[in-house]
């Protein structure tokens, strides 16, 4: 996200509306810094927080998984079951609350689009609320 913001800011465009679409699965300081730099450049920032249905609900089928840590690249094996699903949902709720809280405190419009099943609702309610469509 930081590199994308750097690229935009180096173009020396006049301030305008910037819509950031991200899963925000990165270090909190990274997205906070990127969004803060957009605000400092006087852009009107709007955030669309996206996650897939399975990721946002912890709806993975139970079983053994081999996963790669996005930060370290390390491969690990993990067993996914009801406890892991609940932990996944808690993490998603915490992440969404952190991003929403950061945005709200700084006047950044925030919309959550988790799962394809919510697409119609998102288009009908959230995009107008963001001021993207009428």
Where are these regions (language model features)?
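Active-site metal-binding loops of divalent metal-dependent hydrolases
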Residues: 24
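Small-residue-enriched hydrophobic alpha-helices in membranes
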Residues: 1-6
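Generic enzyme active-site microenvironment
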Residues: 20-21
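Von Willebrand factor type A / integrin I
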Residues: 7-16, 28-134
């Amino acid at each position: 996200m930081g590199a994308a913001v750097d690229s935009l800011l180096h173009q020396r465009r006049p301030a305008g509306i910037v819509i950031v679409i991200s899963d925000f699965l990165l270090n909190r300081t990274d997205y906070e810094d990127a969004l803060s730099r957009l605000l400092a450049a006087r852009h009107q920032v709007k955030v669309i927080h996206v996650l897939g249905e399975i990721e946002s609900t912890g709806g993975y089928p139970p079983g053994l998984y081999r996963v790669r840590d996005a930060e370290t690249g390390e491969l690990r094996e993990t067993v996914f079951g009801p406890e892991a699903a609940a932990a996944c949902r808690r993490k998603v709720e915490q992440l969404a609350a952190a991003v929403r809280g950061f945005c709200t405190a700084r006047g950044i419009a925030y919309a959550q689009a988790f799962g394809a099943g919510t697409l119609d609702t998102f288009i009908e309610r959230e995009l107008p609320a963001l001021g993207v469509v009428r």
